[in-house]
């Protein structure tokens, strides 16, 4: 679930309506054009080439990691590299076993089915998915009561690509049915800088390398955020500058948007200040913290915390969340001696 404040943040890593058109236009079509995630790219390249040489479908693939790192893009690339169709859906959208059956029976041989947020799939639907993934068949119950009978439908061989931000919530039987598992990590500043330069070329936005670097530093390791910031800074450059994005133009634009040098904004600051001021630096439990800042616990856990953990600003322990010395330093607050 996405919180209200997160929906309105320019640096949220979750998908916003404004992202759809720009992401489609900027999305790479091949693994060669896909920047970053080198280990996952190498693995997928080998497995795709092997499957194509044997004229087989690719093994089922699980992509996991924080939102905005390119899981949907990778699924699209895999289908493109395999030369097959891509069908996209999500865990919450498949409410009943019949919904899944309708999707699976309409696939062609070797097609790719991409299920986003697969950790949110209904358990009864998941049980129907097991034989579909393993034996490429569908068990359907016809009728009710004593006259009910089961029939087995053969399915075309297909590749399921599941994407999740919470791999730990997948059941073991489901996780075990994925032959290829790829963890997507936050991008480096250098990788994001290259992505910004590539995107600016496609969008016909004039940008200097130091301007791209400034955007990359504030993009929270996430390409989706980098592209969104580029779009906003391009507008700023056209109105307030000569249309060229330099490091100064990027800094001025992002300061106006409330994005600091590390990519943090008012929501991050509120979360950190709540831990530091209300709870003396922690530890504080997740539910208590969520109530204190008026946010959903899942939004805190999935959207806010991962980047703060990456920066070393907070720590998650058995007793709750604790603000670390780096957070105090960034907020220019003296670190208490007793800690």
Curated annotation (Swiss-Prot):
Protein's organism: Clostridioides difficile (strain 630) (Peptoclostridium difficile)
Gene3D superfamilies xrefs: 1.10.8.60, P-loop containing nucleotide triphosphate hydrolases (3.40.50.300), Winged helix-like DNA-binding domain superfamily/Winged helix DNA-binding domain (1.10.10.10)
Leading EC class: hydrolase
Large ATPase domain (RuvB-L) as annotated region, ranges: 1-187
Record remark on domains: Has 3 domains, the large (RuvB-L) and small ATPase (RuvB-S) domains and the C-terminal head (RuvB-H) domain. The head domain binds DNA, while the ATPase domains jointly bind ATP, ADP or are empty depending on the state of the subunit in the translocation cycle. During a single DNA translocation step the structure of each domain remains the same, but their relative positions change.
Protein purpose: The RuvA-RuvB-RuvC complex processes Holliday junction (HJ) DNA during genetic recombination and DNA repair, while the RuvA-RuvB complex plays an important role in the rescue of blocked DNA replication forks via replication fork reversal (RFR). RuvA specifically binds to HJ cruciform DNA, conferring on it an open structure. The RuvB hexamer acts as an ATP-dependent pump, pulling dsDNA into and through the RuvAB complex. RuvB forms 2 homohexamers on either side of HJ DNA bound by 1 or 2 RuvA tetramers; 4 subunits per hexamer contact DNA at a time.
Domain of life from the UniProt record: Bacteria
Location of the protein in the cell: Cytoplasm
Stretches the record annotates as Head domain (RuvB-H): 261-339
Name the UniProt record assigns to this protein: Holliday junction branch migration complex subunit RuvB
SUPFAM superfamilies: P-loop containing nucleoside triphosphate hydrolases, Winged helix' DNA-binding domain
Region (Small ATPAse domain (RuvB-S)): 188-258
EC assignment: 3.6.4.-
């Amino acid at each position: 679930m996405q919180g209200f404040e997160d929906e309105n943040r320019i640096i949220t890593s979750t998908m916003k309506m404004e992202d759809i058109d720009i992401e489609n236009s900027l999305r790479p079509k091949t693994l060669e054009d896909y920047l970053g995630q080198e280990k996952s790219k190498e693995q997928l390249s080998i497995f795709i080439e092997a499957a194509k040489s044997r004229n087989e479908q690719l093994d089922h693939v699980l992509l996991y990691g924080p939102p905005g790192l390119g899981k949907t893009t990778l699924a699209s690339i895999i289908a493109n590299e395999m030369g097959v169709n891509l069908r996209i859906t999500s865990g919450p959208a498949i409410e009943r076993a019949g919904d899944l059956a309708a999707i699976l029976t309409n696939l062609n041989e070797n097609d790719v089915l991409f299920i986003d947020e697969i950790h949110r799939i209904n358990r009864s639907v998941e049980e129907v998915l097991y034989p579909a993934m393993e034996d490429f068949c569908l068990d359907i119950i016809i009728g009710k009561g004593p006259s009910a009978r089961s029939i087995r439908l053969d399915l075309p061989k297909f590749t399921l690509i599941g994407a999740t931000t919470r791999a730990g919530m997948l059941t073991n039987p489901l996780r075990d049915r994925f032959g290829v598992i790829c963890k997507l990590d936050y991008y480096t500043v250098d990788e994001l800088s290259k992505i910004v330069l590539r995107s600016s070329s496609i969008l016909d936005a004039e940008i200097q390398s130091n301007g791209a670097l400034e955007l990359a530093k504030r993009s929270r390791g996430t390409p989706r955020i980098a592209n969104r910031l580029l779009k906003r800074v391009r507008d700023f450059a056209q109105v307030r500058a000569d249309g060229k994005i330099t490091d100064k133009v990027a800094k001025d634009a992002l300061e106006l948007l409330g994005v600091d040098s590390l990519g943090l904004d008012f929501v991050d600051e509120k979360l950190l200040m709540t831990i530091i001021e209300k709870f003396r630096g922690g530890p504080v439990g997740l539910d208590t913290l969520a109530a204190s800042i008026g946010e959903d616990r899942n939004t805190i856990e999935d959207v806010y915390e991962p980047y703060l953990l990456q920066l070393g600003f907070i720590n998650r322990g058995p007793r709750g969340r604790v603000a670390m010395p780096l957070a105090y330093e960034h907020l220019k607050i003296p670190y208490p001696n007793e800690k």
